[in-house]
Amino acid sequence: LVGSEMCIRDSDETVDELLDEAVELAKNSDVAVIFAGLPESFESEGFDRKHMRMPDCQLKLIDEVAKVNENVVIVLHNGSAVEMPFADKVKGILEMYLGGQNIGTAEKALLFGEANPSGKLAETFPEKLSHNPSYLNFPGNMDDVDYAEGIFVGYRYYDEKGIKPLFPFGHGLSYTTFEYSN
């Protein structure tokens, strides 16, 4: 196992030397695992997100590593849905949300096949912000957000608008197969 740090924590600044180091490591690796997500400047208590983007430095890292290694796995840490323009360029995405103090142990078990990923998404991940049901009425004014979409939330909105989400509510893959019989 080898590693590299690409972005400065809680910054969107790309450090070219670190990017070059990460790409070089990825070229010579069987699998490239990239830990990514949202820093506190993008997502935290006390304010609403203005967009669903991840930091540009992380997107650049994912894009550059995917050019030199076909086996890229992204491990995401974020509090809610993010845009994933890289979804079709990587072999796997492991959504870990904000898992707490023992998250590293869980990630290791999942990445090394010691445990079976079996979670399902508790929300829909739209492809982009403008596909989100609340997009038309957000951000509202300082104190109020008008949720004018009525019953057209979740799958109803996507069905009504003919929009295919990136990952629908309940999406999740597992290594397990099930069979029912009498």
Question: Over which residues does each language-model region extend?
Answer:
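Secreted, periplasmic, or luminal enzymes acting at the cell surface/secretory milieu
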Residues: 77-182
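Short, small-residue-biased leader/transition segments that mark boundaries at the very start
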Residues: 1-8
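Short, flexible loop segments at the rims of nucleotide/cofactor-binding pockets, characterized by
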Residues: 9-14, 50-53
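Glycine/threonine-rich flexible loop motifs
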Residues: 36-55
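A short helix->loop->beta-strand "cap" motif at the edges of active sites that frequently abuts
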Residues: 67-72, 90-91
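Extracytoplasmic/secreted envelope proteins and their assembly/folding machinery
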Residues: 19, 26, 59-62, 104-108, ...
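An anion/phosphate-binding loop that grips the pyrophosphate of nucleotide cofactors and donors
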Residues: 29
